[in-house]
A protein has these predicted regions:
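Short, T/G/N/S-enriched strand-turn elements that build extracellular solenoid repeat scaffolds
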Residues: 23, 33-34, 50-55, 69-75, ...
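Concave beta-strand-loop units of leucine-rich repeat
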Residues: 44-49, 62-69, 82-89, 101-108, ...
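LRR N-terminal entry segment and analogous cap-like coil->beta motifs
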Residues: 19-21, 30-84, 97-101
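Residue-level detector of intrinsically disordered/flexible regions characterized by low predicted structural confidence
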Residues: 1-11, 36, 43, 79, ...
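A generic structural micro-environment signature
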Residues: 7-9, 30, 99, 118, ...
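N-terminal Skp1-binding subsegment of the F-box domain
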Residues: 1-30
Length: 185
């Protein structure tokens, strides 16, 4: 599939008509595009085994729907990535990434890039891996099941912890917003 150079957005949604749906049923796909956002939430995507988004174009934001759980190659210039509920694959994140949101089933070892400033785990996240937070992280949100020891970044300004968090932590002096058990402190 080759997307025209003047494409601004690539959208494949469950509710699109069959004639408008992008045929993503082949085993391997490459997206060569000039769009800056990609949103994929189509049941046909589950047939893809590998998805490559070529980095020489200007894709800055990618959102995958809840059914997406395939291997992906991300562009080097990506800044925002949202992975849906069922995504649980090993993934290499680009050094340009600033915003990252994981869905509820993600539970893989991961190396976070130093460029990351916003990290969110879905409210129902079942993430149980050790994690090293980047030094530049300013916003961190964990879901209600997160309950593991963690060392917070000295640059952290916003922290949200769910009802299941019962660890002692040292809060950095930079912290200006703390939400714990959904109540602002």
């Amino acid at each position: 599939m080759i997307i025209p150079n003047d494409t601004i957005y690539l959208i494949s949604d469950y509710n699109c008509s069959v004639k408008d749906a992008i045929n993503l049923s082949l085993l391997n796909k490459e997206i060569y595009d000039n769009c800056n956002r990609i949103y994929l939430n189509n049941p046909l995507i589950t047939h893809i085994k590998n998805l490559h988004i070529i980095s020489k174009y200007n894709v800055k934001k990618i959102t995958f729907g809840d059914d997406f759980n395939q291997l992906i190659t991300l562009p080097n210039n990506l800044t925002h990535l949202t992975l849906g509920a069922r995504f649980d694959q090993l993934i290499t994140l680009p050094n340009s990434l600033t915003h990252l949101t994981f869905g509820e089933y993600f539970n893989q070892p991961i190396t976070l890039p130093n460029s990351l400033i916003h990290l969110t785990f879905n409210e129902e996240s079942q993430f149980y891996q050790p994690i090293d937070l980047p030094n530049n992280l300013t916003h961190l949100t964990f879901g209600c099941y997160f309950d593991h020891p963690i060392t917070l970044s000295n640059s952290l300004t916003h922290l949200t912890l769910g009802v299941g968090f019962h660890q002692s932590i040292t809060l950095p002096n930079s912290l200006t917003h703390l939400i714990f058990n959904k109540d602002s402190v």
